[in-house]
Amino acid sequence: MSKSTSETWLVAINPHSGNGRGAGIGERVTRYLDSQLVSYLPVAALSATQLSDALRKLTSENSYRGIIAVGGDGLAHLVLQICVPHHLPFAVVPAGTGNDFVRTLGWNLENIEPFLHRVITTEPTAIDLGNADSEWFGAILSTGFDSVVNERANALSWPKGPQRYNIAIAMELPRFTPIEYEITCDGTTFTTEAMLVAVGNGK
């Protein structure tokens, strides 16, 4: 690598996101960066834990220009935990099934090249984030049934795509019971039972 790492982007790729779309979109991203002579280091791993460890190691040893995440909301969440403490800019190239974080920010879901041009040529813009139990979130914090279903869906190897969530709902709903919450909002505290509570940071 001829350039210093401070001029280099880390490109974190989840090849399995979006039913395998992540790999192809990752190739589009790296091809575009090559065409613009942008210095970058691709980072991929077999699991989210391995990817997180690799990114943490790289960012602790050197300074980088930022992180470009190619994946869905899970990868965006993972990268946030690394970028925030290091004050690193980051961008998400949508390649997941939901892409809620990208939709919340109004970023383009299809035109990757013009989006990347903005990423590498303009100054980063600050955004609001939420924090819960020392973890950062960008779009929505979900608790209760929603998070249980998401965890179950992520553990399923079949079926692929959005249908996993329908299967996960069918598996979890019969045994799920409401959770008691204590909520403080605008200075008022109250308790209630609910299937889920979601906190939105955006539209």
Task: Describe each model-derived feature in a short phrase.
Residues 66-71, 88:
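Short coil/turn segments at secondary-structure boundaries
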Residues 10-12, 36, 43-45, 84-89, ...:
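Catalytic core of DAGKc-family lipid kinases
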Residues 75-76, 100:
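Short, active-site-adjacent cap segments at secondary-structure transitions
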Residues 1-67, 77, 81, 188:
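ATP/NTP phosphate-donor binding region
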Residues 17-19, 145-148, 203:
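Short, acidic Gly/Pro/Ser/Thr-rich loop/turn segments
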Residues 15, 70-72, 93-95, 201:
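Glycine-rich beta-strand-to-loop/alpha-helix junction loops that act as flexible
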